[in-house]
Amino acid sequence: MRLDKFIAQQLGVSRAIAGREIRGNRVTVDGDIIKNAAFKLLPEHAVAYDGNPLAQQHGPRYFMLNKPQGYVCSTDDPDHPTVLYFLDEPVAYKLHAAGRLDIDTTGLVLMTDDGQWSHRITSPRHHCEKTYLVTLESPVADDTAAQFAKGVQLHNEKDLTKPATLEVITPVQVRLTISEGRYHQVKRMFAAVGNRVVELHRERIGAITLDENLAPGEYRPLTEEEIASVG
C-alpha cells in the first residue's frame, strides 16, 4: 500500500492532506522520516505519525460489543453518540454493525469491516436467528407463544412474521428467538398481541452468544470459531 493512502485511512483525511503531512516531516517508517507519498509500505514496516505508532491492518476484523442504552449503531450520527465510541481500534470508522440495535436496546452487536460476512447475518435469505431477552409492560398472555409460533400480523404489513420461539421466564420477562430482521420487529410483534416492550436486550446472533464477562460498553475480538460459525 502507498504511504499516503495508509496515512489517509489512519487519520480519516484525504490523500492530498496525507501527502502534505508526509512532506511536512511528520511521518516515520522504521524510525526514518519519509517524505515520499508514494513510498511502498510493507506489512513489516513500523509507521508513526508525530511519534505516535500507527498499526497496519491485515485482513478483516470482527468484534462483539455489549451495547448500552443511549448509543446508535450507525457509524456517523449528528444527534446521538455511536457505538464506535467504545471501539479503541485503528480506523474504527471502517467498522460497521452486522445487524443494528435501536438506541434504547442493549446487548450483542457484532462489528466488522467484512461486508460479505455481515451480509450473511443481515440478508433475509440466510434466516440468521437472533435471541432477545424481553421485559414486558403486562404479563404475557397464555396464547402468545402459540401465536408467535404460527406468525402474527404486524401493523401495515401484509405477510405474517416467520415462526418464532417464545420462552416464558417470568410473567413479564420472556426470551424470544426470531429469524427475520424487520423494522422494530420484536416491539411490533408484542404490540400485535396487545402488549408493550419496556426493555429489550439481544443475547445471541446465530451461534454467537454475548460474552457474559463483557460489561456494558466493553468489547472483544471474536474467536475463530465464532467467525466461522457465520456462513
Curated annotation (Swiss-Prot):
Which SUPFAM superfamilies does the entry link to? Alpha-L RNA-binding motif, Pseudouridine synthase
Q: Which residues participate directly in catalysis? A: 102 (nucleophile)
Matching Gene3D superfamilies, A to Z?
Answer: Alpha-L RNA-binding motif, Pseudouridine synthase I, catalytic domain, N-terminal subdomain, RNA-binding S4 domain
Give the EC number.
5.4.99.19
According to UniProt, the reaction catalysed is:
uridine(516) in 16S rRNA = pseudouridine(516) in 16S rRNA
GO MF entries? 16S rRNA pseudouridine(516) synthase activity; pseudouridine synthase activity; RNA binding
Tell me where on the tree of life, at the top rank, the source sits: Bacteria
Keywords recorded for this protein, A-Z: Isomerase, RNA-binding, rRNA processing
Q: Its GO CC terms?
A: cytosol
> What InterPro entries does its record include?
PsdUridine_s_RsuA/RluB/E/F_cat (IPR042092), PsdUridine_synth_cat_dom_sf (IPR020103), PsdUridine_synth_RsuA/RluA (IPR006145), PsdUridine_synth_RsuA/RluB/E/F (IPR000748), PsdUridine_synth_RsuA/RluB_CS (IPR018496), RsuA_PseudoU_synthase (IPR050343), S4_RNA-bd (IPR002942), S4_RNA-bd_sf (IPR036986)
One GO biological process from the UniProt record? enzyme-directed rRNA pseudouridine synthesis
Regarding protein family, the annotation reads: Belongs to the pseudouridine synthase RsuA family.
Task: Please give the subunit comment from the record.
Answer: Monomer.
Physiological role = Responsible for synthesis of pseudouridine from uracil-516 in 16S ribosomal RNA.
Please report the name of this protein according to its UniProt entry: Ribosomal small subunit pseudouridine synthase A
